[in-house]
Amino acid sequence: MINSKSRVIRIVALAIVSVFILLCCACVQEKDEPIVEYYSKIENWAYYAEGEDKAADLFLICPTVDMGKGGNYNMSMDDTKTKESFVGALNMERGIYEDSAIMYAPYYRQMTFPVYNMTADEMQPYLEIAYRDVADAFEYYFENCNNGRPLILAGFSQGSQLLLMLLKEYFDDPKYSEKLVAAYCIGWGITEDDIAQFPHLKMAQGEDDTGVIISFNTEAEGIEESLIVPAGTKTLAINPLN
C-alpha cells in the first residue's frame, strides 16, 4: 500500500504546478433532504465515480467560482450557469489526478467572492454552510463508495480552505487517516498554529511521504501580504518539484 501511495504522489507532483498557475488568475438555498438522500443523487455531484480501474479515489473540492453578483453569499444549487463555471474550474484541476484516481467532486453551496471581504465573525455562517455541504458529501462518499480504497484529497483556494477543515474534523480517526495517500491543499495558508492545535496533521517533507498535506502558494514579487498570507503570517509549504 505504501509503495502504491508513493507512486500516486509522484505522478501528480509536476502537473500541479502548471495547473496552479492557471487557476491563480444574501440568499441561501437550503438542502431539505437528509445527506444520504441528497448526495445519493448523481445530479448533486459535478463528478461521481469518474474513471475506472484506477489505483485510488480522489475527493476534489472546487475553488471559488461564484462572484456573488446577485447579492448572494452562498452559491445556489439551482444556479445552472454558475454550476457550468463550477465544472469548468474542476476541469482545470482534474488532469493532475485523473490518470491515478477515480474522481468524486460534489456540488456545494460555496461562499461567494464578496464573503472574503468580511470579518471572520461575519464570514462564519456562510463558511459553515459551505463546509457542512462538503462534509456531508464526504461522509456519503466514504460510507458508500470508498470500499477501502486509497484516497487522495485535493482542493484549491476555497476548496483547500474547506479541505483543511475536513482534515481537522475527520482525519484524527484511523478509519479515515489510514486510507489517505495525501491531501493537496493548494492555494491556502496552513500555519504552525494549525499543526499545533491539530497534531494529527502532518506536512509533507519529501516525495515518498504518505498520509500528509502538500501545500504551497505563489505571490508576485514585491507582494507583502494577501488574503491567503496576511501580513506577519508564516505558512507551511513544500516545493512540489523536490
Q: Which sequence ranges carry the predicted segments?
A:
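Sec-dependent N-terminal signal peptides
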Residues: 9-19
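Active-site catalytic motif of lipid deacylating hydrolases and related acyltransferases
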Residues: 61-149
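Loop/turn elements at helix/coil->beta-strand transitions in domains of secreted/extracellular proteins
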Residues: 54-56, 99-103, 147-150, 177-181
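N-terminal secretory signal peptides that target proteins for export/translocation
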Residues: 1-8
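N-terminal extension/subdomain marker
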Residues: 30-85
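Gly/Ala-rich beta-loop-alpha elbow adjacent to hydrolase catalytic centers
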Residues: 155-159, 163
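Surface cap/lid and interfacial helix-loop subdomains adjacent to catalytic sites
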Residues: 133-147, 169-242
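C-terminal motif of bacterial Sec signal peptides marking the signal peptidase cleavage site
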Residues: 23-26
